Amino acid sequence: TLNLPAAGLAAGKRGTIDVNAHYQTVVPHIYAAGDVVGFPALAATSMEQARVAMVHAFDLKYKTKVAPILPYGIYTIPECSMAGETENGLAQKGVPCIAGVAHYDTNARGQIIGARHGFLKLLFAPDTMKLLGVHAIGEQATELVHTGLVALHAGATADLFIETCFNYPTLGELYKYATYDALGRRAKLRGESQAPFDPAAEK
């Protein structure tokens, strides 16, 4: 065993070790990162935690904290990935949202690669159309989520995806059409005669 008490440490009920924002334990010269500190226990986040710990240990003043929004990926078939808020999470907070969905089987690249199943879902704030969450299930979902992750960090709105010119044919275009879908849903809820943007006009 590790004999943690000999180092002045103790594991919690789930075998994890408590750390502060710098991943420093109660023993100042001992740091912990990764699975041993608990959720989310992912490779990507573990590496970021280790960088933060190293920077603090050597007083480098560079990367002082882990990014507030993290991506989560499950490498199943099909892949699943997300970043930001979920519909259930927002509902529990009493925060309204508009969801927009684009399916792989209606996307040119999705058709080319034979991805009959899969979708990208984007969550927006109804009033400002600020992006709140991104969810993907399907081929390359763990890659696809990164576009949304960057947009979340930038505090982007639907305008970013509408105004961006995506390569054609690519799965990246799903962002534009999921946004069109969200705008259409919002227009319908507001009783507007038509959505402010027409996806068909893009073709």
Segment roles from a protein language model:
Residues 7, 71-72, 120:
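Small-molecule pocket liners
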Residues 36, 70, 104:
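Hydrophobic pocket-lining residues within nucleotide cofactor-binding pockets
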Residues 40-47, 55-89:
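Rossmann-like dinucleotide-binding cores of NAD(P)H-dependent redox enzymes
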